[in-house]
Design a protein with these regions (language model features):
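Flexible, surface-exposed loop/gating regions in the mature catalytic domains
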Residues: 30-292
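Secretory targeting and sorting signals
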Residues: 1-26
């Protein structure tokens, strides 16, 4: 939102050096030169998909829009998830820790532990998570909509008591006037549109329909779009697709190693927030040229 635009912050970008093992040993992050500093984004929209390794999506003919996005944005070619199964990776991205969760069980009630949503709100910014097939704002149930529907295990903010119920919205509330977006928004598609239960072509077509216009808008409105995955298809490598597009992003392939912790650290640095958990030991994503 324009009232929150501030300058002088090192922004968005690209590649984390260093990552965590599956046991989450903290490693010393090495410094990386920033190519460009720029204004803080007015909006960052993050869409999280499910369970696909990098080469099952990037370069695959059944995901044409995702590949268009990668060709026109920053394709982070060595981005890795933290662990298996799905749920702890969402928690890592949102809070800097898997919070000791090692399963997909529901519910996990994590109390008032630090997390990105609470940090943004406390700093005077705004946060909303939009979940497809969520039946109503603030709903805390585990599943809805049957096969291909909503699952709470993919919606990390619901597990934290210090994130207001009003920050958890059905995807039907996603604003089509993008100026009304919160500072940081997550979109969690249902199990069909996130590539989990349905063919990737279905998800790719849905992504194009829902977000192609936002990506074009973001390029001229100081905003960013991040597409990432929770994990790969259960391999030890856990190599996942991640693309950044929007204002000032230089289209290219970026080969430095990156993780969800580095992505979280980037968001925290953008908005002057204190790193949480293992994001404190992760270098922010750097190297993508950002600036207007």
């Amino acid at each position: 939102m324009t009232q929150f635009r501030r300058t002088g912050a090192a922004v968005a970008a690209v590649l984390l050096l260093g990552s965590m093992t599956l046991a989450e040993r903290q490693t010393q992050a090495r410094p990386v030169a920033v190519l460009r500093a720029a204004t803080r984004p007015d909006h960052v929209l993050i869409v999280v998909l499910e369970n696909k390794r990098y080469d099952a999506v990037i370069g695959h003919r059944k995901a044409p829009w995702v590949n268009e996005l990668a060709a026109g944005g920053a394709n982070l070619t060595h981005f890795y998830a933290e662990t298996h199964p799905s749920q702890p990776n969402y928690l890592a991205l949102f809070s800097g820790s898997t919070q000791g969760v090692r399963d997909n069980k529901c519910p996990h009630n994590l109390g008032a532990r630090p997390n990105l949503g609470r940090q943004l709100i406390d700093a005077g910014y705004s946060f909303t998570g939009y979940s497809e097939d969520l039946p109503r704002p603030g709903w805390r149930g585990c599943t809805h909509g049957g096969h291909g529907g909503y699952v709470r295990r993919h919606v990390p903010w619901v597990n934290f008591s210090n994130v207001p119920a009003s920050a958890s919205q059905p995807y039907t509330a996603f604003p089509r006037d993008y100026r009304k977006l919160p500072t940081v928004a997550f979109v969690i598609p249902n199990l069909c549109h996130d590539m989990h239960d349905c063919p990737k072509a279905n998800a790719d077509a849905w992504l194009r329909k829902e977000f192609a216009r936002y990506v074009a808008w973001a390029k001229t409105h100081n905003s960013l779009f991040v597409l990432t995955f929770d994990e790969d298809n259960q391999t030890d490598g856990n190599h996942i697709p991640t693309v950044v597009a929007g204002a000032g992003i230089k289209p290219s392939r970026y080969p430095a190693r990156a993780t969800h912790y580095g992505l979280l650290r980037t968001l925290q640095d953008m908005y002057g927030l204190r790193p949480t958990g293992l994001s404190a030991g992760a270098a922010p994503l750097r190297g993508v040229r950002v600036g207007r």
